[in-house]
């Protein structure tokens, strides 16, 4: 993308078969909500996650309500690897999920990139977006911690079939902004 974007990458090795990760991905609309107690909704408006498909994610992390709609811009998949890239409708966030088969199981990579890619005005707009308008939601450490937690949850899901305990929605929504 562009060096002015903020890019966060978290990766994890999981000693589970690639087929388990592939099955998890194939059922993403349902699995997204079960993946983390902070994930509230996932809608694949076209019923799939192919390039061009419309998607909505909603999660509440530390009282911040992230409700994002966008489009899958890339979707590659074969028997050893998958890569799915999502771009928000505002074109200020890109989320990439990538999985691959390894000798000991599978590898999962979760990348979140934020900012405008437009040359010249991109830097100014990023300043306005991150420092002025969405200062609270542009908490990079909070987002990174959530990504790390998501990876730990995925490890447990794929190795033990163990999902995290749900947090009641009213508790998550208390004081959410």
Residue ranges: model-predicted function:
Residues 7, 161-168:
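Extended beta-strand/beta-hairpin segments
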Residues 17-24, 142-146, 150:
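Short amphipathic alpha-helical segments
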Residues 9-11, 67-69, 94-96, 111:
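Well-ordered beta-strand positions in beta-sheet-rich domains
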């Amino acid at each position: 993308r562009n060096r002015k974007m903020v890019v966060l990458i978290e990766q994890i090795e999981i000693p589970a078969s690639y087929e388990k990760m592939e099955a998890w991905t194939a059922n993403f609309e349902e699995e997204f909500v079960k993946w983390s107690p902070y994930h509230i909704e996932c809608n694949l408006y076209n019923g799939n996650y192919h390039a061009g498909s419309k998607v909505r994610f909603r999660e509440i992390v530390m009282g911040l309500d992230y409700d994002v709609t966008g489009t899958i811009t890339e979707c590659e998949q074969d028997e050893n690897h998958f890569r799915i890239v999502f771009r928000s409708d505002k074109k200020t966030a890109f989320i990439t999920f990538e999985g691959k088969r390894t000798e000991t199981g599978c590898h999962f990579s979760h990348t979140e990139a934020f900012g405008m890619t437009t040359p010249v005005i991109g830097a100014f707009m990023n300043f306005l977006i991150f420092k002025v308008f969405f200062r609270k939601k542009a908490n990079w450490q909070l987002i990174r911690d959530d990504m790390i937690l998501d990876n730990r949850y995925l490890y447990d899901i794929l190795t033990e079939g163990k999902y995290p305990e749900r947090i009641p929605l009213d508790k998550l929504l208390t004081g959410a902004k």
